[in-house]
Amino acid sequence: MAERWRNTALLVIDMQNDFIEEGAVTQVKGGKSIVPNVIRVVELARQRGILVIWVVREHDRQGRDVELFRRHNYSSEKVGPVIKGTVGAELVDGLMINEEDDYKIVKTRFSAFFSTNLHSFLQTSGVTKLVIAGVQTPNCIRQTVFDAVALDYPNVTVITDATAAATPEIHTANILDMKNIGVKTPTLHEWSEELA
């Protein structure tokens, strides 16, 4: 079974406290509801021998590496979201990096490919198939997926109920956009059946 999935990687994107927890400045409203499904996707991936890659945002305390439109959230008096080393930058409860087998990518922009070593790491690992879970569908999920397609990954899958946006309407519209460029969009149940 593991042989079937050896060219596959699961990208778990931005499942961090500052994006998921109630009351966080950058909370994705639909994020909390997908946590159990993301946990299950990770469990299934590990059972099948699929490489798990954790994609997280981490910024410096002054926000010098954050997008211009977010810099107002960072100053010497104000701690912005997902500051490296803070609780807000940690993965939500229930998700843990397996230091021996998993890989972690730190990004400072929407796409997991932008100014990171993700593409070269996937190439040297022999990965040609990507499965995506996490938040937020119109931003980091979508940009990563569109970049993967632009980089000619032949098989990109977004687990629709293990990804989320601020509203169901935004989520659905973005899933449709990704489906229209050839991305597979199964539910967790459909994807788990494919794994059997």
From Swiss-Prot:
Signal peptide: none annotated. GO terms for cellular component: cytosol. InterPro entries: Isochorismatase-like_dom, Isochorismatase-like_sf. It comes from the Eukaryota. Coiled coil: none annotated. Belongs to the isochorismatase family. Does not possess nicotinamidase activity in vitro. This is Probable inactive nicotinamidase At3g16190. It comes from Arabidopsis thaliana.
